[in-house]
Amino acid sequence: MMVIPLQAVPSQAVTVSLGGQNCQISVYQKSTGLYCDVYLNNSLIVAGVLCLDRVKIVRDAYHGLIGDLSFVDQQGASEPEYTGVGSRYLLYYLEESDL
């Protein structure tokens, strides 16, 4: 398991190597919650996924990502919002062995 470094801003994109895979993760706040898009090798694999506490983001292996992503509330079980991203709400990369 690995924490992906994010900042408490309303919209951001990070590029990171996850299990040897080139990934870009976009995280953005809307009025209805925090959302995420995931690119694998510059190809969009999931878009507009509502980020929920301890719920996988990619969910299906057929998308090609080895492992998965999930936000975890460090202080309880609230749904993530951008003001706490990077401190209260951490984005984890879950390796295959973590699933």
Label the predicted regions:
Residues M1, S43, G76, E96-L99:
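Compositionally biased, intrinsically disordered low-complexity segments enriched in polar/Pro/Gly
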Residues M1-S26:
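Short, charged/polar N-terminal "headpieces" of proteins
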Residues P10, Q29, E95:
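A broadly conserved detector of short glycine/acidic/proline-rich loop/turn motifs that flank catalytic sites
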Residues S11, S31-G33, G86:
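A general secondary-structure signal for short beta-strands and their flanking turns/coil
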Residues S26, V72, Y92:
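Residues in well-ordered beta-strands of folded domains
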Residues S31-Q75:
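Acidic, aromatic-enriched beta-alpha/helix-loop junctions
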Residues E79-L99:
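Short, compact, well-ordered microdomains
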